[in-house]
Amino acid sequence: MKTLYSLRRFYPVETLFNGTLALAGRDQETTGFAWWAGNARLINLSGKLLGAHVAHAGLIVFWAGAMNLFEVAHFVPEKPMYEQGLILLPHLATLGWGVGPGGEVIDTFPYFVSGVLHLISSAVLGFGGIYHALLGPETLEESFPFFGYVWKDRNKMTTILGIHLILLGIGAFLLVLKALYFGGVYDTWAPGGGDVRKITNLTLSPSVIFGYLLKSPFGGEGWIVSVDDLEDIIGGHIWLGSICILGGIWHILTKPFAWARRAFVWSGEAYLSYSLAALSVFGFIACCFVWFNNTAYPSEFYGPTGPEASQAQAFTFLVRDQRLGANVGSAQGPTGLGKYLMRSPTGEVIFGGETMRFWDLRAPWLEPLRGPNGLDLSRLKKDIQPWQERRSAEYMTHAPLGSLNSVGGVATEINAVNYVSPRSWLATSHFVLGFFLFVGHLWHAGRARAAAAGFEKGIDRDFEPVLSMTPLN
């Protein structure tokens, strides 16, 4: 393989902490990286780098399978998923596997199958990773030119990008196929408290789908996170899958335009930084989605959202006091506003008390009680169903709060109850991971730009300000 540039120019020399440890073709002298820099030693060894990536995929899939089986082994069907600290089974249940009306788990066998399939896949990936890391060719360019590459080869890089986009598009269409033809998905909005159904009347209108992208991200609007029906979600996946596949074909067939060649840095570390930036954005979006959205992440499996738990508490006490004879339409609270019901600034009838800040919550157990002007007093008096009372009481005591005391007027459990909502876990973990991926993006982007500009060795030490300062001692 012809290396198009010197290693020294693009890869800074790191300090070797252990000079005696040397592996043929993997030591500091031949790669410019010390042993602790991991896969950086394999930057120009496409075969070995393939092994590292396949092995990494094996670890990821092994975790998924093992954790899946762990959750199945610990699962208690009588308790809601969100009380059991589960993060994988809720995803499988949302896809419509093993659940029936109201989100009740009727069969755990599909979950077991999922775990076993992932374990078997991880074994295949693990074997492939070890093979390519230890036995396979060091570089792929000579033997398998289709899979070989040089980082500076812009045409090859966009071809690889295109292949990735096509795979992502196929992934989006797998959800579409599940929703349309293979048993459907769980719809929390199905009448009577949620059910699995096939999605038939897809939303394909570009004005609706792309309207989400044009919405404000702030309260009441909520950008794409505000999606609240499965027709839009599955229709969006058709659009997204189509765009990804067409974009992938485009990137395979074309070469980068001159402006793109000039605008981007074309090196392995630059591509790493772009990928980290993309993953960071995904992490932040996922954080907001799992925290606020109860359609893509049904509350039956993930527990209520924060606003939902707060509104559920107001609803629960409205039901109780109405039964005890309170006139919920006119009772005054301690602030002079309505105790149970009040009007929002725009005139809708909303729940009173601290939960007024969450007045724009939409939830399947509450929407049937709304009329054209917000909550309908006559429906609140005559139409409340037992399942709505049960669900709101359950949600009231399972707020996604990690606090020791009450927050936002929501009753939290007594200290003897060890409850952390999966929404809290998933939102927090994705925010933190998104943040660190963003820091990694800044770090690798800075190094890649410096290497491309030819000054990755750092600033000239002769002119450092500290040299002209008085020593500390």
From Swiss-Prot:
Segments traversing the membrane: 69-93, 134-155, 178-200, 255-275, 291-312, 447-471
Entry annotated with the keyword NAD: no
Compartments where located: Plastid, Chloroplast thylakoid membrane
Keyword field: Acetylation, Chlorophyll, Chloroplast, Chromophore, Manganese, Membrane, Metal-binding, Phosphoprotein, Photosynthesis, Photosystem II, Plastid, Thylakoid, Transmembrane, Transmembrane helix
Pfam families attached to this UniProt entry: PSII (PF00421)
GO CC list: chloroplast thylakoid membrane; photosystem II
Free-text comment on the cofactor: Binds multiple chlorophylls and provides some of the ligands for the Ca-4Mn-5O cluster of the oxygen-evolving complex. It may also provide a ligand for a Cl- that is required for oxygen evolution. PSII binds additional chlorophylls, carotenoids and specific lipids.
Residues at which [CaMn4O5] cluster binds: E367
Primary location: plastid
Protein name per its UniProtKB record: Photosystem II CP43 reaction center protein
Lineage, top ranks: Eukaryota, Viridiplantae, Streptophyta, Embryophyta, Tracheophyta
Gene label: psbC
